[in-house]
């Protein structure tokens, strides 16, 4: 079973294909666990067979869980609800828009600049933060499940972290933007939207290939920027209390998989 997840403001969210489980450290020190079944897009089984579309669909299904997590916890636990995170995201979006609006410079350098400028505020905010430690706890709990090791012994960087999408997205965005320029349609909103969706779909395909071939030299090369970002900015070594929270989320997810095997195979 493949498990994904994300750090919450005071906890961890883990997901399998069919279920989600979140564990939150309450103000009184207790751990609150919430869980449920994931909603799937209509025709999900068919969509999962379509290249370029399937990765985006899986991403959408993962993000669709967040409102349910918010309702279940009854507190502002999502990272996006932190005012500082909102400000950093707004700054990133503004800088990205400004860079993409200019026609000066090499397309390659522009994509690299967009990647750097769009990430910089978020990375500075995350570095050595509580969220980064919970991110590390999330990775360690998943790695421990996959390898059979103790969470404390597992690495805080993980091969399937969304950070590792950076290189695929830069490459696919460069390709679609060059295509738009060649066609003279880089200023058309609809063409830009379609190119963006194609770029994201292609990046997700490449990301999935990297996850299936983790020891391939190309996969290791493409993963390197994301791993280094995890090491330096987006993850920190968690405390034992934070590992306890991540373990609670993992235990609940595994309980659901064991308790409802028919649903898990549906």
How does the language model describe each region?
Residues 1-266:
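Short amphipathic, positively biased membrane-proximal segments
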């Amino acid at each position: 079973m493949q498990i994904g997840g994300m750090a919450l403001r005071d906890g961890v969210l883990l997901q399998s294909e069919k279920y989600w489980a979140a564990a939150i450290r309450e103000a009184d020190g207790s751990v609150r666990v919430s869980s449920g079944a994931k909603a799937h897009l209509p025709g999900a089984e068919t969509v999962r067979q379509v290249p370029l579309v399937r990765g985006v669909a899986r991403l959408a299904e993962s993000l669709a869980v967040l409102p349910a997590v918010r309702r279940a916890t009854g507190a502002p636990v999502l990272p996006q609800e932190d005012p500082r995170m909102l400000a950093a995201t707004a700054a990133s979006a503004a800088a990205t828009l400004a860079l993409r609006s200019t026609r000066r410079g090499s397309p390659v350098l522009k994509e690299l600049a967009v990647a750097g400028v769009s990430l910089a505020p978020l990375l500075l905010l995350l570095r050595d933060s509580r969220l980064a430690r919970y991110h590390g706890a999330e990775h360690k709990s998943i790695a421990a499940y996959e390898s059979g090791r103790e969470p404390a012994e597992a690495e805080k960087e993980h091969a399937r972290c969304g950070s590792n999408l950076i290189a695929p997205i830069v490459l696919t965005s460069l390709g679609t933007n060059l295509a738009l320029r060649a066609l003279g349609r880089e200023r058309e909103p609809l063409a830009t939207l379609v190119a963006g969706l194609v770029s994201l779909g292609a990046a997700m395909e490449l990301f999935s290939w990297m996850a299936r071939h983790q020891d391939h030299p190309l996969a290791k090369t493409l993963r390197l920027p994301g791993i280094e970002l995890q090491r330096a900015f987006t993850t920190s070594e968690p405390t034992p209390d934070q590992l306890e929270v991540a373990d609670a989320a993992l235990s609940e997810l595994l309980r659901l998989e064991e308790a409802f095997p028919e649903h898990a195979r549906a």
